[in-house]
A protein has these predicted regions:
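Glycine-rich phosphate-binding loops of nucleotide-dependent enzymes
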Residues: 1-149
Length: 149
């Protein structure tokens, strides 16, 4: 059901309504633009790109929009790094090289924090959550639960 709502898999029957609008056949990008966020169960398969930096993973859902991209489609790496640094501090993400740390080099708990920070920062209308605190320490679990709720 989670993959159907987020658009990762097509639904087999029925409809998915968001604020009365049928989103069943919409692309993942369109669902994101309508305000659907998704904290995935498998962070390494669907949640982030291990070869990308923290900054790139934070911007991945909106890389084509300002401030991450100009109207001509040129990426603004400074804006990406700035937002990532802000979220690294806010969510206590342990990233050795700050926003330029490769996501795959971080612990599973810190990878999870990157995903959670990205999704919460987007202020989604609907946040679909599967095991959001998996791999996190007790202090981080409490902080994340407060931010989600």
């Amino acid at each position: 059901m989670i993959y159907g709502i987020s658009g990762l898999l097509p639904i087999q029957s029925g409809k998915i309504l968001l604020n009365g609008e049928d989103i069943s056949k919409l692309s993942i990008r369109k669902r994101i633009e309508l305000g659907i966020g998704h904290i995935q169960e498998d962070r390494q398969k669907h949640g982030l790109v291990a070869e990308f930096t923290v900054a790139e993973n934070i911007a991945i859902k909106n890389y084509y929009k300002e401030p991450y991209s100009t109207k001509y489609g040129i990426l603004n790496m400074e804006a990406m790094k700035s937002k990532a640094s802000e979220l690294i501090k806010s969510f206590d993400i342990r990233a050795g090289e700050d926003s330029l740390t490769k996501a795959g080099s971080m612990s599973g708990g810190n990878q999870q924090k990157v995903i959670i920070a990205r999704e919460i920062e987007l202020s989604p209308e609907l946040l679909v959550v599967a095991q959001p605190t998996r791999g996190l320490d007790v202090g981080a679990i409490e902080y994340i639960r407060k931010r989600i709720i």
